[in-house]
């Protein structure tokens, strides 16, 4: 999973982009280890469930936006098979470098340095677009969704896996305490990067809940939207489609 005291809502788009870029440039080599620790390894089971719901077809073409160190990219490559193709895109060169080390031996993966707000692809070319714990880092959530909508083929699927907001009182209180006190401490102890990982606390609190995100996806044009919260609602999967052409 992906500041300091200044809230990002006070930053313009360029300032937020630069801040987030610096965060991931600095934590790239420690990102995977700390993710396992701060999520208690739950992020793997969330993604496993999500992949089952996607039921990816062999031979498909997929785009993993904000691919980070490449874990979901690799799973998508396995799912589409040798006749499929998966592109992982990220704006952090250092995160891509880690991903490259994991994917050098995988023939159907291509990694690209690029901007999720201006995807370097033509319209209507991907069967699937995915974004895992990256949407909240974009300066404009709706613009990011619009770009993924644009590059999807009609009938194509988008899947968003992201932090969310627990609704049960026990989980809600625990969530606030964990992100405010425990998670930044993990960052300091295990990654020597409390400053960078405090961004996770902030971006998670500011990101819409699962119901609001579903509405935002509908406003973008996606249909047949379904979502599911995980682990008391601390994260959520959203799955939707670009309408088929009439």
Swiss-Prot record:
GO molecular function, one term: demethylmenaquinone methyltransferase activity
Enzyme Commission number: 2.1.1.163
Binding site for S-adenosyl-L-methionine: 69, 90, 115-116
Pfam families with a match to the protein in the record: Ubie_methyltran (PF01209)
SUPFAM superfamilies, sorted: S-adenosyl-L-methionine-dependent methyltransferases
Top-level taxon of the source organism: Bacteria
InterPro entries the record matches: SAM-dependent_MTases_sf, UbiE/COQ5_MeTrFase, UbiE/COQ5_MeTrFase_CS
Pathway(s) it belongs to: Quinol/quinone metabolism; menaquinone biosynthesis; menaquinol from 1,4-dihydroxy-2-naphthoate: step 2/2
Broad class of enzyme this protein falls into: transferase
Keywords: Menaquinone biosynthesis, Methyltransferase, S-adenosyl-L-methionine, Transferase
Enzymatic reactions: a 2-demethylmenaquinol + S-adenosyl-L-methionine = a menaquinol + S-adenosyl-L-homocysteine + H(+)
GO BP term (any one): methylation
Family statement: Belongs to the class I-like SAM-binding methyltransferase superfamily. MenG/UbiE family.
HAMAP family hit by this protein: MenG_UbiE_methyltr
PANTHER family for the chain: 2-METHOXY-6-POLYPRENYL-1,4-BENZOQUINOL METHYLASE, MITOCHONDRIAL, METHYLTRANSFERASE
Function: Methyltransferase required for the conversion of demethylmenaquinol (DMKH2) to menaquinol (MKH2).
Protein name as catalogued: Demethylmenaquinone methyltransferase
């Amino acid at each position: 999973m992906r500041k300091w005291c200044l809230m990002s809502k006070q930053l313009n788009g360029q300032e937020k982009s630069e801040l987030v870029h610096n965060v991931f440039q600095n934590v790239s080599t420690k990102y995977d280890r700390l993710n396992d620790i701060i999520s208690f390894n739950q992020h793997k089971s969330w993604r496993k469930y999500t992949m089952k719901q996607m039921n990816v077809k062999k031979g498909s073409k997929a785009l993993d936006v904000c691919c980070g160190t490449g874990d979901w990219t690799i799973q998508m490559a396995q799912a589409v098979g040798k006749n499929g193709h998966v592109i992982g895109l990220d704006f952090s060169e250092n995160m891509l470098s880690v991903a490259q080390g994991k994917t050098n031996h995988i023939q159907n993966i291509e990694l690209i340095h690029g901007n999720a707000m201006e995807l370097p692809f033509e319209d209507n070319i991907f069967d699937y677009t995915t974004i895992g714990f990256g949407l909240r880092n974009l300066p404009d959530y709706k613009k990011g969704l619009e770009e993924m909508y644009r590059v999807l083929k009609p009938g194509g699927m988008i899947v968003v896996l992201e932090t969310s907001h627990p609704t049960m009182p026990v989980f809600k209180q625990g969530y606030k305490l964990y992100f405010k006190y425990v998670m930044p401490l993990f960052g300091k102890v295990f990654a020597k990067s409390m400053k960078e990982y405090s961004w996770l606390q902030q971006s998670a609190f500011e990101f819409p809940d699962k119901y609001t995100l579903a509405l935002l996806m509908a406003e973008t044009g996606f249909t047949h939207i379904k979502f599911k919260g995980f682990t008391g609602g601390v994260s959520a999967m959203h799955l939707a489609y670009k309408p088929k052409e009439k």
